[in-house]
Amino acid sequence: MPAESTFDIVSDFDRQELINAVDQARREVATRYDLKDTKTEIVLSEKELTITTESEMHLTAVRDLIQTRALRRNLSIKIFKFGPIQEVSGGRVRQVALLQRGIPEDVAKKLAKLIRDHFPKVQPRIQGDVLRVGSKSRDELQAVIRLVKEHQDEFAIPLQFTNYR
């Protein structure tokens, strides 16, 4: 048995599920009566999602549609960080949503402090965009997972637990 057990806290999403959710939203926009003739464009790139349409009302409807499709595919809507609505040429509007992947350093520090405050014998270590938590006791690690799940609403990113060893 290893001397120390560890697990990683990560913030990630299944890209293929996001692609499927966006494709479903595109199909629904093309067939839905109120959105059919709005020339709505939904562009998914590696790090962002761009929605361009005719009015703010249509933009809000498309954004809600994408979020609903993402939720149905077990993706957290916290992966979308929507920017401001911008006016573009032709009276159209655009909104860019950054796709959040990885734990930002400030969130990792807050998580590490939360863990250290409740479990002094547990060692959280920030490793890039992953927070590795180690302890000699597996029971303490399971208690840390419960603690982080209870406080997950305080963080603006979705958290998953991987590599439990």
Curated annotation (Swiss-Prot):
MF-aspect GO terms: nucleotide binding
Alphabetical keyword list: Nucleotide-binding
Highest taxon listed in the record's lineage: Bacteria
One Pfam family named in its UniProt record: DUF520
GO CC terms of this entry: cytosol
Family named by the database record: Belongs to the YajQ family.
Listed name of the protein: Nucleotide-binding protein RoseRS_0530
